[in-house]
Regions:
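Structured, basic alpha/beta domains of bacterial-type, RNA-associated proteins
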Residues: 1-19, 23-145
């Protein structure tokens, strides 16, 4: 029985599974979003969030080397520490989001999903007012008889 066994095996050897997660995490940090199966997206999400937390804590040689043990390309590690980490400096967690897709993969009918970095494709919903609201724009209540 497989009770209390965490993680998915994906019918791969441990080294192949580890390399799969490394490649998915590297591609996610490089492109900002990837389309994959739902199971792989759920498995790579905590893996990626731990790496982003390393970069969020700031650049030092130890954190950079720890990130390089996970990522497969050095330029992605530089981008992680220079762009992605500072972007999430004030965010306490939840750097990625998984969207389930309605379509399934044609060959084996597996559920597909998009995993993306939060804030990668979002635009601010409110305009940024530099000077604040002026008194002329606040609504006036008419007092009449």
């Amino acid at each position: 029985m497989r009770h209390r066994k965490a993680g998915r095996k994906f019918k791969r050897t441990p080294s192949h599974r580890r390399m799969l997660l490394r490649n998915l995490a590297t591609d996610l940090l490089d492109h900002g979003r990837i389309t994959t199966t739902l199971a792989k997206a759920k498995e790579v999400q905590p893996y990626t969030e731990k790496i982003i937390t390393l970069a969020r804590d700031g650049w030092n040689l130890n954190n950079f080397r720890r990130a390089l043990t996970v990522l497969t390309r050095r330029e992605v590690a530089f981008r992680l520490f220079n762009e992605i980490g500072p972007r999430y400096k004030t965010r306490p967690g939840g750097y990625t989001r998984i969207y389930k897709l309605a379509k399934v993969r044609q060959g084996d009918c597996s559920s597909m999903a998009v995993i993306s970095l939060v804030g990668e494709d979002e635009t601010p919903s409110k305009p940024n007012l530099q000077g604040g609201a002026s008194p002329a724009t606040t609504p006036q209540v008419a007092s009449g008889v």
